[in-house]
């Protein structure tokens, strides 16, 4: 892992700023820039699976999904960003089910 909590906070803040600045006319360019979806009526929601991809490939920082998942709740709490744990329907009830997060960058 070459990403720490502060780097993740910086990335989430950058994505928040990009989201706030985006309009329906510019969101496609924003999504291309970060190679991830910004969803919701205000383009303020992202998913940790895509965030993981963007961190590794756009920001050129290496982190595993497990490492990202361990940092996300703390980073989101510090930034007052909403987050919800997600588990695939076919994994519900399984021990050690893979998780991901839906992150609301701003409200």
Functional labels for PLM-detected ranges:
Residues 1-49, 53-58, 70-77:
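Positively charged, polyanion-binding regions of nucleic-acid-associated proteins
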Residues 1, 78-107:
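C-terminal engagement modules used by replication, chromatin/transcription, nuclear envelope/ESCRT
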């Amino acid at each position: 892992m070459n990403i720490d909590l502060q780097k993740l906070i910086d990335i989430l803040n950058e994505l928040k700023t990009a989201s706030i600045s985006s309009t329906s006319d510019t969101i496609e360019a924003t999504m291309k820039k970060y190679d991830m979806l910004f969803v919701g009526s205000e383009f303020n929601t992202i998913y940790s699976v895509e965030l993981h991809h963007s961190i590794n490939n756009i920001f050129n920082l290496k982190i595993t999904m497990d490492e990202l998942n361990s940092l996300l709740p703390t980073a989101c709490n510090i930034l007052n960003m909403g987050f919800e744990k997600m588990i695939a329907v076919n994994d519900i009830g399984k021990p050690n089910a893979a998780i991901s997060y839906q992150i609301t960058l701003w409200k």
